Amino acid sequence: LTAGLLLLGFQAAAQDIPQAFQGKWAGHYEGKVSPKHIRALCAMGYDENAAMDNVYVSEDSGFYIEIGKKSIELTGWEWGAKYTKLNYRIYSPDKIAGTARVREEEPEQGTQIYNDNFEFSLNRGVLTQRFRDFSTDGSGKKVWRTRTLMRCK
């Protein structure tokens, strides 16, 4: 039984991220955005100086997730993280969740490497990420937050 469970864990870790998740996604650090804002964020890319037509989007409001076959890369204003060595707890065409090795880059903190949970789901072309982050109440506690993103075309 133990050998079977170990093999199952290895197979889950070796699987590619489902094709439906792969690609570049844009949104805000937290919360929802409109299709108009997504088009502007996708046009802006990682260049905060790019021209934006009729849409106010500041350089610190854009958030991008690029999902490949084996990794997930998150990029925000002066911050980035790459998730590798994914081990799935849930693996389906519309939801993936599990643990990963994270390499986080931040100017004030430098580079940090740690293991963390990840959770992504798809519903009608919208990518939702649930993630843990520090509370804004100053308590230092971590709370669950949600961000929604749409695919860049």
Residue ranges and their predicted role:
Residues 1-3:
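Sec-dependent signal peptide recognition
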Residues 9-11:
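N-terminal signal peptide c-region/cleavage motif recognized by signal peptidases
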Residues 16-71, 106-115:
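Short, solvent-exposed loop/hinge segments that bridge or flank secondary-structure elements
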Residues 56-104:
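Predominantly extracellular/secreted and cell-surface proteins with exposed
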Residues 58-61, 80-86, 109-117, 141-146:
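Short, surface-exposed coil-to-beta transition loops
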Residues 83, 87-90, 124-153:
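Edge beta-strand at a domain terminus
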Residues 91-124:
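Acidic, glycine-rich flexible loop segments
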